[in-house]
Every structure is written in C-alpha cells, then in structure tokens.
Amino acid sequence: MTSNYLMKTCTLILNRSKLWFAGSVVLAIALSKISASETLWSLKPLVRPALPQPSITNESNNPIDWFVDHMQVQQGLKPSPRASHRQLLRRVFNDVWGLPPLYEDLEWLNETGMEKGWAQLVDRLLGSPHYGERWARHWMDVIHFAETHGHDEDAPREHAWPYRDYLIRSLNNDKPYAQFAQEQIAGDAMHPGNAESLIGTGFLAAGPWDESSQMGIQDGTLDKKVAQYLDRDDMITTTMSTFLGLTVHCARCHDHKFDPISIEDYYSLQAVFAGVDRNNRPFDRDNDIHQKRQTLLSQKTDLLADRYPESELLNQHAKTRVDRWTESRQSVLDRWTFSVPDFTEETASKASFQPKDHSLFFPKPASNQGLLAWTFTSPYTKPTGIQLEVLPDDRLPHQGPGWASNGNFRLSEFKVFSRPAPTAPWVQVQLQQPQNDFSEHTTSVRYLIDNDDKTTWGILPQTGTAHRSFFEISPETLIQEGGQIKIELQHHHKEALWIGRCRVSLTDAARQDIQPFLAAELAKAFSTPEDQRTRVQQLTLSRHATLEHWNQKLNELPPSSQVYAATSFFHSAGNFKPSLGPREVRKLIRGDIQSPREIMLPGALSQLKDIPWNPGERELSQESERRLTLAEWISHPRNGLFWRTMANRIWQHHFGSPLAGTPNDLGHSGQAPTHPELLDWLACELRDSNGSLKHLHRLILNSSTYQQSATFRDAAAKIDASNQYYWRMSPRRLDAESFRDTLLALSQDLATEMGGPSVKQFNMRPGIHVTPIVDYKGFAPGESAMTRRSIYRFLFRTLPDPFMQAMDCPDASSWTPKRTVSMGPLQALALMNDEFVIHMSQRLSETLIKDHARVPSSITALFHKALLRDPTPEEILLFSEYTSQHSLANACRFLFNSNAFMFIE
C-alpha cells in the first residue's frame, strides 16, 4: 500500500468525521512519517528503463510511442489516427514558434509528404530564432520574471531585459541544460568576466523585491533581518522548484511534512544565498574591453589601498604624468575667482574685508542664532561650482575658524541666491554634490543644503586650521555675468557657534575638472616648488596624477552595459547596502526571527546522499563559491530530479499537460507521473544527449503520439475522460502571447527585430509614491512599439496589461508552472472590443482588399491565412453577407473570436 493511497484515504476519513483537531494533527504527523519512510519516485536513481514491447498494431519506430502504447493497451485504449496536414502545421508552428504557418507551408507539406517533409519541417522550426522567443516565455512563467519590483513600491527595472535575451540566445543555441542551469545560479563564478554567464544570474533576481523594506528599514533590526530572510526565500523557492520540482520552502518553519527535507536543509540553502542581493550589475560584452576595464579597476584598488608599488609612482613615466597633471590642475585653479563683497547685510554689516586673501572677518556675535550675508558681482555667466573656505585667525579662540570657545563653529545652512539686476527678485541657486575635507562626528557638509535647521556642519577637533566645502551648481541655474549673487550663512544652533573668518570662490571650469584640492596635504604638495618637494609629497602628487590618468582611461572605454541580476557589490541606496560577504544565517525555530538557533553552513538536501556536496572542497567563504557549489550539485548527472523536472516541462508544453501533473512539486503531495517509465526515459535522453533540449523536442515532435488527431471518441472518453493516456491530442486554446503575435503575423505587421530593451506598450507618468501610473488604453494600437513580439513587452507586476490578463497571461508576482486556461464572457468582450484586436482586424482587411478585388476571394484568403483551409460554400455565403453589412474588418474580428481560430487541434 503506497503512502499516497494512505494519505488520500485518511484525509477522506477526516473530512467525513468530526475528530478533534488534536487527533488530526497526530494523524498528519503519522502520515508524514509514512511518506518520509517510502522512497519518493522522483528521488530514486535515474536509470534508463527497458523499452516496452510495442503492440502488433503499433508500427512506430519511436520509443515514445512504445511507452504510450504499452499503457494504452493496459487500459483498453487505442491511439487516434494521424491529424491532417493542416492541423499538424497549426499545432507544430504554435508549439515551437508561437506563430501561425503560411498557406504556402501547407502546400509544401502536401507536395513533399509527411515521410520526407515532416522531419525537415521540425528541423527548420527548431533552427529558427522564433523557437527561443517562444520557449523563453515558458521559462519566464516558471521563475515569475517581470521588470518591476512588485509589492507596494512597484518600481521599474530598466535593465532586466538582458536576462530575457540571454534565455532566447541560450535556447536557440541549444545550450547544454546543465550549463544553462549553472549559469543562472552561478554564472559569474563559473566564468568570471564572461558577460553571457554573468547575465544568466538575472535568474536569481527575476522575482519580486520589497524595496520599501530593503531600503527603508535600518540594518541590524529584526524587521530588516526578516526582509533579508524572505528575499533569500524567494531565491531558494525559485531555484529549487524550477530545477528540481520540490517545495523546499515548506521546510522553513519545520521539517517538511511530506518530503524528506529537513529544516536544517532549508537553512543550509539560506546560507548558500546569504551574501546575494539584487541590483543593476555592469558588464562588457567585448572581452578585450572587459580585460582593460578590470586591469584599470584593479590598479585603482591597489592604489587607493596603498598597495601599489612606490617605485611605479616615482619613475620617469610617473614624473611625466605628474608634470602634465599639475599643469592641467593649475589651469583649472586659475578659473577659480574669489568673491569681492559689494556690501554686507544684517549681522555681517560690521564685517571687515581682507583684500590680500579675499576673506571676510566677522565680529563676535551678539546672539546665539542669526545670519551672515553679503552680496557680490558674478564673474561668470554660467558658474559650475562654488567653494566655502573657513580660515584660522589669531583674533579667534584657538585661532578659530569659529567663535566657539574651542575654535569650532556649527553652520546650519549654506544658501546662495542670484538675480540679474538689483531690482529683480532673488532666486535660490540649487547646489548639489557637496564635498569637504573634514566633518565633525555627527555633522556633515551635506547638511548645509538639506533645508533642516537642526542639522549642522562643524570641524571639531580640527580647529585652528583651514577647511573647505565644495558644491556643484545645478546646470539648470541661470546666472548672468555681472548679475548679483547673495551668500547666506545661517546659524541656528542653541549656542553662539558662528563662523569667524571665511571666503567664497566661484568657477566656470568643466564639471569633470572642478573638484577642488580638499586634502590639505595635497594642496601643500601642489604649492611646494618641484625641487623642494619631499618624497612623501612626490608620492602624494603622483598618486593623484596616476588616479586621474586611470580615470581618464576608464572614461575613454565604451560605457558598460547593465543587467538586473544577483550581485554582492553595488552602490548603497538608503539602508540597502551590499553585504560584501555572506551574512550570518541561523536556523529559525518555527521560522521566527526571534527564535534563532545554531549558525548554519551552506549545503543542500541531505537525503540525496548519492550526489556529492562540494567534492572540490572549496572553502565556501565567498558567496559566489557557495552558489557555484549548489549549481554543480543541482545539475549533477546523478541528480534524477534535475533531469526529470525539465523533461516533464518539455512534455507539458507539447501536449498541454505534464506527465507528472504538478511540475513544480514532484514530491509526495504532488501528482505521480502517469507514465513513470516514459518520464525516466525522456530524462535519460536529455541527460545522455549532453542536455540537448532540441533533441527532446525532435523525439516528441516526430512521434505518432504527438501527431495524433484531436478527434473526440465516446468509447475512449468513457475509459479515460481526461486523456491522461494520450489516446488523442487534446485541443488547446491559443495563449495570450500566441493570440497577440498571431494577429500581428496575419496582418503582416509583426516586427522581425529581436532583443533589446523591452517596449512599453503603455503611457507612463510618475505616481504619488514609487509605483508609476500606467495607462494601457491611452496607448495607440498603431504605434510601432505594438508590433514587437509579446515576449518583448515590458512586464509590470501590479499593473498588468488588462487584455493580456483577460487572456490568462499569468501574474508575475507568483510562480506559474502551469497556466490557468479559462473561457468566459470577459474574454469574449476583450476579443470583440479591445482596441488592439480592432486595429489588427482593420489592418488584415486592408491587406486582403489590396490583394483581392472581390469579396468571396477575400474571404477565401482570410480562411487560408487564419485557418489554413478553404472556406465551405456556406461559410463563403455567411461571411460575404456579414462583410457587406458590417465590413471586412468586422468579418476578420468575427473569425478571430471563433473556436476554429482560438483553438489548436
């Protein structure tokens, strides 16, 4: 007696009785132990099964047909005859390309014949780029790929599309399935520097991401840890369900109730992904450019970490670089002009101007809070930067530069205003990119432009010396030469911590050149005559000259591309910061962040003892090593789950249903395969053909089982109403993408362009928060963006296309191993009234009218295009009358709504 049978029987007893809840729990635990004790079919070693003996009536040479025939004989079933050429063409074109065949394809197959022509046709279809475009969409369903974050802040991911193109290329190139899987889990670790492998890690970043939690919650808090655990849970679930068809995430709170997966296994997988985040990741498609960039970046890293050899900084090449650099920097410094005040205002009215160094000295303040302000004439039409220097002075406590008893100051706001003439109103100048040479703890130069009176900039304990703050002036700022500029130094601190002496300067130098000498030692080395510079000063100048030289070389390289993918290194945004290494992962009892237990080491499923974990004995201190080890474990030749899962998915998309009915759950709670030997044989074929997916496609497409008619037979249906033994081909409705792309192809509007950024088939404007406002109806159906294949559409999670949603295009917030196929009034209304369908009907009618003068001829051409057959006399009469009353465009739309068009037999 199998555990599945016991579980179903006991569940039925529970449902029909009124046992206490406690009894139900005890029984559930008992059932889980029965399940765990029985070897799960999907966990058994993958061994090629013996081929069954075909029945006398089975003349096929394809082993697939022998396995299917063997099961049919046991059930008293017989296969259906071969479908017509027309039916087969519509079926295979839709399955492999997601596009309709041409009537010329039917004429060719009729002339060539099935025996010779079918295999040629299959090779042609699998060799076309359209194959990858069709089958990549299936993969995107499984991994819930979309191009926005989802959750409450559904921000767009503008660089997710390279991963989609990676899928299409990989499938078209028939990349070995093991390599395909490994690249998506750890491609960056497999082949460092290889762009294609790096792009593959977009797989781990395909799912939703909680921006508000990741960026808004402070590190180290319980809520942030919960967000990080949940983010890794998405990666674990996607990885294990996609490649192994297991519900590993069910072991997050306790041992899996049905499958041999422990809570320790789950948190070992959490440790594998402990250093992984999602962000835009730069890459170079050209390997030579990549090598140059990496060399320069490595040299920069060594230089900034003081690891670069001093000998390389003091040789003749370095001296030449320093000479060129100091000359160029001097020309930039010459563009800085000190302000000469026209007059002072308010508390600055008693300030004294020092012409020798262009500084202003302010007397001791009479109050704790107040304003220092003065105006001057702008020397430039479009200044690019402004600098505030605070200077020491013997008249100040401890030489200043502030009036505090220790020489410090606390400046609250630094504001700049401009006006073209004395009678014009003042307009505030927008400042950005603040920098300085030093800030007191808890203060910052960026606080000077944050419009917050409570935040300040100070310099304690570095008093008695000069300090600089620098700001870029926004490019949108309009300042005219000869116009007036006003400076305001606002002091809002509770004590009289005013600036005592300072000066302001402006520049109009190019923005990339206007960074001032903020480091005092650099400024001193620069101002020292060359023959008097110490070794330390020479090294200081050489480091900066070399750094600028390398930055220039980097800027000369073509800009890097970007992909939204798994990464451990990125620029911080709010509280979202790179871990720079694996985070600590602890086992959480009941999945509760407040019930942590022992620290977990990276690992996989302990019950699969036949598959070695980390046979190369990597240290696993780097997160990329952990992912690579998991990728190799998952794709191991002895991992039957890996090969069975993919073979099951391929079968599913050719027949409408998988051999094992729950493709993301091959465990005890899922459905066992109807043809276990066939599934194992297909899995072995996939494994032993170097992971060739196209090999499996050919086997299936060339089988008699695939080529059967869809004709319904009462006698067979009484035995097998659900057609699980494949006595006929089950009719299937066109999915959303196939329907849309078919309309484009029939109207001859389908764009042949492949790849590139996703097309936004909607109008978008900023929303109240992060999620934008998206308008699909306002986007004209005649726009060129609408002619691209559906796989190139920009995919929103929370704001999907209403028409595609009505046609059962899946919700990308969740995994979709099998799409729901519904038939209801909403679809009929969408098919009749959607602007895209109306436009495509009009475009097709224009083509028909152009090529055919008479209505009956147009009707015949319409049937050839849409249904691949001649219309009957009754259909010609019906459509001709309808056309005369309602137009040919409406007749096209009428046909698009028919079962004959919507369903593939």
What are these regions (language model features)?
Residues 390-392, 488-495:
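Short beta-strand-plus-loop segments that form exposed binding edges in beta-rich domains
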Residues 190-298, 302, 487, 497, ...:
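Sequence context surrounding c-type heme c attachment/ligation sites in exported
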Residues 318-371, 392-394, 417-481, 579-617:
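Disordered, acidic Ser/Thr/Pro-rich linker "stalks" and the adjacent N-terminal cap
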Residues 398-413, 496-502:
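Short coil-to-beta strand junction motifs in C2/discoidin
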Residues 50-61, 205, 209-216, 220-232, ...:
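Electron-transfer interface patches adjacent to heme c in soluble/periplasmic c-type cytochromes
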Residues 56-90, 95-96, 100-130, 145-192, ...:
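Primarily short, surface-exposed interaction patches in extracytoplasmic proteins
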Residues 379-385, 479-486:
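Extended extracellular/luminal ectodomain segments enriched in beta-structured repeat modules
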Residues 29-52, 137, 148, 157, ...:
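Post-cleavage N-terminal segment of exported redox proteins
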